[in-house]
Amino acid sequence: RVVFFTDKDGDDKPDSKKNLFTGISGTQHDHGIHAVHFGPDGKFYFNFGNAGRQIKDEAGKPIIDLAGNEVNDKRKPYQQGMVFRCNEDGSDFETLGWNFRNNWEVAVDSFGSVWQSDNDDDGNRGVRINYVMEYGNYGYRGEFTGKGWRDKRTNIEKEVPLRHWHLND
């Protein structure tokens, strides 16, 4: 879950606590949720890897993002790891990118560009740094079939690092 603490009087002790988001799988898993950061626009940015599965509100209801989609990995349309942006209160929730494996620590630069790393599943032979172009599918699994990089497919590359991200499908 994502817990939001507020210090109203500046004494470095929380005066209130709110469960902003719940239902996220992968607790204590390196493919689960990662740190929340503020962007220069004052919004929260965070991500989870492919163990995150879904995100729900404080009451346990599925989050519906600004595109009108339920935020989960059931391929309708999202799958695998995702990166998000929302207001401090959780409103205006956006799914900025999806179909990552183990995307790690989203970062937002002073221009508002979003960056993160994503790594493979066979000894780091396919690690990549992503510029997160908003609303993109980043290809860890095949978009139409959901197949992984080990599955036979048209134009399969000979080298493992080139297979991971379906760049030649």
Label each region the model flagged.
Residues R1-D169:
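Beta-propeller domains with acidic blade repeats across secreted/periplasmic ectodomains
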